[in-house]
Amino acid sequence: MIPGEIITAAGEIELNAGLETVTIEVANSGDRPVQVGSHYHFAEANPGLLFDRDAARGKRLDIPAGTAVRFEPGQTRQVTLIPLSGKREVFGFRQQVMGKL
């Protein structure tokens, strides 16, 4: 073994396997790019993003941890969301929940 080496199991790892998903269309109505991180409560994302916020309540992007999706000005794209897990409590962000979902 080499110091710092990572030895992984054979095969592929499926992220977020078995979680319920919802796909929504998101449009950036602003004049600047907006980036949303993997674990951000999507319903509280930048108000310049236009989408069904009720459908996004309690959900985050279905992307690898530590990554983000960028919405360029005027861009419309579809994203897939998965439920937030754990205690399902949301604090901070834009302070629209501040407690249990």
UniProtKB/Swiss-Prot annotation:
InterPro entries: Urease_beta-like, Urease_betasu_sf, Urease_subunit. It is an enzyme of class 3 (hydrolase). Keywords: Cytoplasm, Hydrolase. One of its GO terms (biological process) is urea catabolic process. The keyword Hydrolase applies. The keyword rRNA processing does not apply. SUPFAM superfamilies: Urease, beta-subunit. Belongs to the urease beta subunit family. This is Urease subunit beta.
